[in-house]
Amino acid sequence: MKIASNLKLFLGLASLSIGTTSPALAIPVGDSTSYEMLSEPANESEVAETSKNFLGTVALSNCSGALVQFGKAEPTSPALVLTNGHCVERKLPQPGEVLVNLPSRRTFNLLDRSASNVLGTVNAKAMLYATMTDTDVALYLLDQTYEEIKEQYGIDPLTVTDQKPAAGTPINIVSGYWRRTYTCSIDGFVPELREDGWIFRDAIRYSENGCAVIGGTSGAPIIAGSDRTIIGINNTINEDGARCTRNNPCEVDRTGKIVVRKGIGYGEQVFWFHSCLATSGVEVDLQKPGCLLPKPH
């Protein structure tokens, strides 16, 4: 998991259930919930200059993310931002925990096309959903509509796919935090990706060259080629070749065989959201029949 911090920290989240609200508690740098993270900038050889387009991406204080829209949302709907569950401003979600409908004051910087400038800052009013179970996602509701953001900053949201991506798909991982783009392809899918106590299912494995993601790239959108569709969300990489430990995820196949791939990065699925969206397209309905997202116990 790729949070940026000069002290290599990992933030945490408190356990909450549907409908529960609680004041936001940011964990400061150096807190006892520290989690080792890389923070060095990427090697320029890993960045495809020709594929850089940062419109729709956002920079968080510790991670990357994107301004997103699902198919049903209207221009007058409140806008959404998508990032990793381990990037939220609260305590780290433990295995099995799901957080929903929490107040939030998180801020996100919108970047211009080349990431040379910050066009402005948008603000969350709620964290609609966050988890590190089966996937690693957090979805924020903003206090502005898509239409208002377009009028003020000229930014359109990125569309989130409703289909599972295919192996071999060329991808760009666009990090708003580092203002860098990584280019590779989807090598395949992992039935079970283990990292310490967390388990991610149907994880996206990156090809060997081009996507050696680092701290701060967590939550960056995985964009399919040049069509600007988000087909996944960047998450983690095996840094040291260790087996199933923090910052060293391992693959578990359907027979239970464990495989370690040092230097290989992974993302998580996002199409699951479509199975859980309310008719508004900006609310998560975990009781909807067929909803694939994990639910609070």
Where are these regions (language model features)?
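A conserved glycine-rich beta-strand in the N-terminal activation segment of trypsin-fold
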Residues: 53-84, 219
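Boundary at the C-terminal end of the N-terminal hydrophobic targeting segment
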Residues: 24-26
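Bacterial N-terminal signal peptides
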Residues: 10-20
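Active-site region of chymotrypsin-like
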Residues: 52-63, 145-155, 180-273
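Conserved catalytic-core segment of clan PA serine endopeptidases
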Residues: 29, 34-54, 69-71, 89, ...
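Bacterial N-terminal signal peptides that target proteins for export
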Residues: 2-11
